[in-house]
Amino acid sequence: MQRILLVEDHASFRQTLAYIFDGEPDFEVVAQAGSLAEARRTAVGVGADLGVIDLTLPDGEGVELIRDLREANGDFAALILTASVDKTEHARAVEAGAAGVVHKSADVDEILDATRRLAAGETLLSQQEIVELLRLAGQVREEEREAQASIGQITPREREVLQTLAEGLSNKEIAARLHMSVDTERTHMMNILNKLGVHSRLQALIFAARYGLVELK
């Protein structure tokens, strides 16, 4: 009997999965959770053999949970459930120790088959797929490092310029809001573009929003 930790933020989907797993002779759902914090609490002491874990949770990512659980128990097996087709997200899950990724649109038999294969010690990915995903994860980490280095160069005044840009203000409006000349505003913007390695105000705004430099209202 394989003991399952089921982590999924949509209660109805989670309850359906639990009903399906508990109806199988070789599975038992020993703990359920709808968030990262709840999963960390409920996972303690239940002795789960494997986890069926949502990639995106309200208060974090399934990747964080997998990493924690595998650090505590190197034999813990994890299957990621996701609605995403973004390979970079899959790559991060595999790098954290997930043995496979199944889309939420998969039918019941596919989810059960994937879980049984996982319980048998199989991985759901070929060696080539694993290598490609790990390579992609490395590229993502490098991009993150470069982004953080760029962010570190942005001055408080330049952050103010970015924030007013996020509010949809024009050059003149930004200058007026921040009590500077239009030429000074343009100089700040040029410095921002250079530091972030982008070529337009729109690209700067996208970068700033992605990495939390601005608050979008």
Predicted features by range, described:
Residues G168-Q203:
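Recognition helix of helix-turn-helix DNA-binding domains
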Residues S35, E61-E64:
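Acidic catalytic/metal-coordinating carboxylates
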Residues Q32-L50:
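Acidic, metal-coordinating helix/loop segments flanking the phosphotransfer/catalytic sites
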Residues D54-T56, T82:
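Active-site residues of response regulator receiver
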